[in-house]
């Protein structure tokens, strides 16, 4: 398993706070969200949203980016969000790599 960041954004017009279709997706999906995640072998660690910026970042643990792609489609979030999937590492790993490289 590996850590990934799911960075997403949508327009003001497609925001679930403003758009009834997007809101329906969010409210309908919330009932099965954990099941959809489990089906795609994803463990959701954190979810952060900036409502007025219309952006979000979710931190997940999964085997590969393809699982995330399928999860975003299955959950409906890909219907109104542009999504970027980014592999993540812990900051401490950067520090250790710098120490090994020296100055």
Describe the predicted segments one by one.
Residues 68-76:
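Short amphipathic alpha-helices in soluble, non-transmembrane regions
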Residues 1-54, 63-67, 88-103:
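Short S/T/G/P-rich N-terminal loop/turn motif that feeds into the first structured element of a domain
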